[in-house]
Amino acid sequence: VTLNGYIAPSIDYFIQTDLCDRGKMKILDAWGRIAVAKGLKFQAGQFRLPFGTDAFRGPGNYVFSNRSFIGKDLCNVRGVGAKLSYTIPLSGYQQLSIEGGAFNPTSISDHEVWIKELSYAAKGIYTIGNVKLVTGVQSISPDSIRVNLWNASCTWATGRWTLEGEYMNKHYTHNAHKTAHGWLLWADYAMPIKAGVFNRASFQ
C-alpha cells in the first residue's frame, strides 16, 4: 500500500507498507521532503539509501517479477536518516543530480537494536539525451565489520527499448570475507496493448 502527496507546494511525503511480508506487516518507506531552494531538497525518515540503480527501485518499479541478485542479495538497505539532493540543469539535454546522506540502518520497526556506527551513502546521476550514467558509494556497518560498496551503471532508453548494465563491488574491511562482485545486464522491449486494465506487454 502506497500513500504520497503534498502538504504544501514545497513539502511532500511518501509512505509505503507491505501488508504481508512472511506473515508480518512491515513499513518499507515513511519520509518527508522539503524543497529548500531551487534544485536543492532535504529528505528525512526511513527510505532506501541513495545507492545503486536496480537496488534503488521500489516494488512498483521492478523490471521483472522479482528483484535481481544485486537488488535482493548484494545490496538491499533501507535506513532511518536524512539526505540532501541537488539537481544541476546543464546545457542541452543534460542534467546532473547528486545526493548523499547518513543513516541508522536499523528499520523503524525494530527498536531493540542499538547501532553505534552510522551508515553513509552517496550517488551521482548524469543524464544526456537517452543515456543515464550512475555511480555511487555506500559504507555500512551492520555488525562489527564495516562493508564498503561502489557501483556504476548505464541505462539507454528510447522508444520501446530499454537496455541497462550495472556493476557492483562489495568489500569487507579487515579481510573478513572475500570481495563480492555483482553484474546485471538486461534488455526490455515494450509493446502497447489494450487488454482490460493492461496497456503494455514486455519482452525481456
Language-model features and meaning:
Residues V1-S107, K116-L118, G124-K132, L184-A190, ...:
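Outer membrane beta-barrel
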Residues D18-D21, F69-C75, I108-V113, S139-I145, ...:
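Outer-membrane beta-barrel domain signature
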Residues I115, I125-Q204:
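Detector for outer-membrane/organellar transmembrane beta-barrel domains
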